Amino acid sequence: RFCGSVDAIRALNEGRCTVAGFHAPMQPAASSLVASTYRPLLATGQHKLIGFAVRQQGLMVAPGNPLGLAAWSDLLRPQLRFVNRTLGTGTRLLLDDWLAQQGLDGRAIAGYAHEESSHAAVAARVASGQADAALGIESAARAHQLDFVPLMHEHYWLVCLKSALDTPAVRQLLAVLSAAGWNAELGQLPGYASEALGGQVHSLKRTLPWW
C-alpha cells in the first residue's frame, strides 16, 4: 500500500504493515524539522533500519525548463505556480524543513496549499500545464516527459521492528536487496543508485547522524 514516509512509519508502529519505507537527507541537522519529526516515531532497540537506496530529489519542470529554475529559492518567485505534496509525506517534510531553515512558512510559496498525494500526481499536474514546478523524484519526472532539476541526495531506508527480522518474509527481502541483480535493476531507475549497505541491517544510533 502506498503512503508517505511519516504515515508509513506510523502504520508500522500501529501494526498495519511489517516493513515501512522513509527517506531523509544525507546529513540533516539534529535540530532540523526532519529529525524532530522522525525521531519520536523510531525507538532505539525496537526498530531496525534496512539499507535500500540513494536517490535525488529536485524540481520537476516543463521540458526545457522555460522558467530557468535552478535552486530551492526559485520556489519563492511570486508568479511561480507550485504544486505541493500532502502532509505526512517525506517530500513535503523536506520542503517544510527548508522553509523552516529560511524562517519562512508555506505562505511564501504560491501554490503551497495545492496538494497531491504522490510523485506521479504532482508530475501530472506539471505535465498538464496546471503547475510550473513540483518537488519530487527524477523517475516520476521522466515518466511524464518533464525535465528535472536536482537539488539534493537522500537516503531511502526501510524500517521494521527488531522482532520481525527473523520472519521468513523479511529474511527473503534482505536476500533480494543484497543480490547483485537487484542493484542492477535499481540502477536503471532515473535518479536512483543502490545503497552501499543495501540489504544490511543497521541500528538507528549508529546509522542516523542526527539521532
Residue ranges, per PLM feature:
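Periplasmic-binding protein-like
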Residues: 43-56, 146-175, 196-202
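Flexible hinge/capping segments at coil-to-helix
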Residues: 52, 61-82
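A ligand-binding cleft/hinge motif common to bilobed small-molecule-binding domains
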Residues: 21-38, 123-152
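Short helices/loops that flank or line small-molecule/ion binding pockets
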Residues: 6-20, 25, 115-130
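Short loop->beta-strand "edge-of-pocket" segments that line small-molecule binding or catalytic clefts
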Residues: 73-93, 97
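Short beta-strand-to-loop elements that line the ligand-binding cleft
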Residues: 1-3, 106-119
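N-terminal hydrophobic or amphipathic helices and topogenic motifs
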Residues: 1-16, 41-47, 70-73, 100, ...
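Short helix-loop capping/hinge motifs at secondary-structure junctions, enriched
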Residues: 64-70, 104, 163-169
